[in-house]
Regions:
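Active-site catalytic motif of lipid deacylating hydrolases and related acyltransferases
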Residues: 46-104
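Gly/Ala-rich beta-loop-alpha elbow adjacent to hydrolase catalytic centers
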Residues: 111-116, 120
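Cross-kingdom Sec-pathway N-terminal secretion signals
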Residues: 2-47, 61, 70-73
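Conserved serine/cysteine hydrolase catalytic core
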Residues: 211-257, 262-266, 270-273
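Post-His helix in hydrolase/transferase enzymes
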Residues: 273-288
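Flexible "cap/lid" loop of the alpha/beta hydrolase fold
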Residues: 129, 135-179, 217
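A cross-kingdom C-terminal cell-surface attachment/processing module
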Residues: 302-325
Length: 327
């Protein structure tokens, strides 16, 4: 079942609390339960040209995590770019993506998983070509919020089991210099299956993903958002109901606040790995109709056409009755 929703909390937290939230930034697959009244996708914009789909990964992943989604979209004729997210700083990552978006001609459907959601939120602001935002178990921060703050809003993340630990217990922190807070964060191999995948993949695939994960700086999760694209661009949201990285309740909060067209999928944080079809279908919906859903607006083009047809039918019927009475 699919649901329509949208979601903001803002408080400065110590590094001990913020680091755990970092664990919320990856990409993955799922099974879907729908909530919402979005229109059926046509796979094209109003001009008939298919938009370019840009995919942005998050923490502990890389662009290859989108492979099956890329294949599925390309099979249907969509231009696709799976970008390499630097994972260094939110502003720097957003600037990097924004430059890529400016080089793309025509409409864009912008998709972010995990921390990638925070990046697309900042990068898309002010770009008229971005017609849809799609959050795949991703952060959708408001202005001045950080990813780590949002990850700590409600329980559900298993990035740490000791809130007083200097580094979240599921993470390894690798120093990048003399400053002890300047670290790269890795998800421990022995925690990867549970935290990132909810123990839903076979051991061989899990070990490959753990070995090839890309780290992110703690600074990237601590940097406040400056631009909020979901306030002006229609958004879609996939909520993973077994998300142990960001936490399912945190996903629901953000989706509801953003008034996103939302689906809930029985899946882990790494939804693309377990449920690529559900991810693909939501992207296709966003690509097919970038307007807000009927539940939000109360009307759409199809409703207007049907309403017009109904009015004509009633008018014609009335005329027939009048003529019959006169003859």
């Amino acid at each position: 079942m699919k649901h329509i929703r949208r979601t903001a909390a803002l408080r400065v937290l110590p590094l001990t609390v913020l680091l755990p939230a970092a664990a919320l930034l990856t990409a993955g697959p799922c099974l879907a339960s729908e909530s919402g009244g979005g229109t059926t996708p046509t796979g094209a914009t109003s001009t008939g040209a298919k938009p370019t789909v840009v995919l942005v990964h998050g923490y502990w992943a890389d662009a290859s995590g989108w492979d099956r989604i890329v294949q599925a979209l390309q099979t249907q004729g969509y231009p696709v770019v799976a970008t390499a997210n630097p994972l260094r700083s939110l502003s720097g990552d957003a600037d990097y993506l924004a430059a890529q978006l400016k080089a793309i001609e025509g409409p864009i459907v912008l998709v972010g998983h995990s921390y990638g959601g925070a990046v697309i939120t900042n990068a898309a602001a002010g770009n008229p070509n971005v017609e849809s935002l799609v959050y795949i178990a991703g952060f959708a921060p408001d202005k001045d919020e950080t990813a780590f703050q949002l990850a700590a809003k409600y329980p559900g993340s298993r990035v740490t089991d000791d809130p007083n630990a200097p580094v979240p217990t599921a993470l390894n922190a690798v120093p990048l210099g003399g400053d002890p807070t300047n670290v790269d964060l890795y998800l421990k191999p022995e925690k990867f299956a549970d935290v990132f995948l909810s123990n839903r993949l076979d051991a061989a695939r899990t070990q490959v993903l753990a070995a090839t994960q890309r780290p992110a700086t703690a600074a990237s999760g601590n940097e406040p958002t400056q631009s909020v694209a979901w306030k002006t661009i229609p958004s879609w949201y996939l909520i993973a109901t077994d998300d142990r990285t960001i936490g399912t309740d945190n996903l629901r909060f953000m989706a509801k606040r953003a008034k996103a067209t939302t689906i809930e999928v029985n899946a882990p944080h790494a939804v693309m790995e377990t449920n690529p079809d559900d991810v693909t279908q939501l992207i296709l919906k966003a690509a097919g109709d970038a307007r807000p859903s009927l539940a939000e607006t109360g009307t759409d083009q199809r409703t207007a056409l049907l309403g017009g047809a109904a009015a004509l039918t009633v008018a014609a019927g009335t005329a027939i009755v009048i003529r019959a009475r006169r003859t």
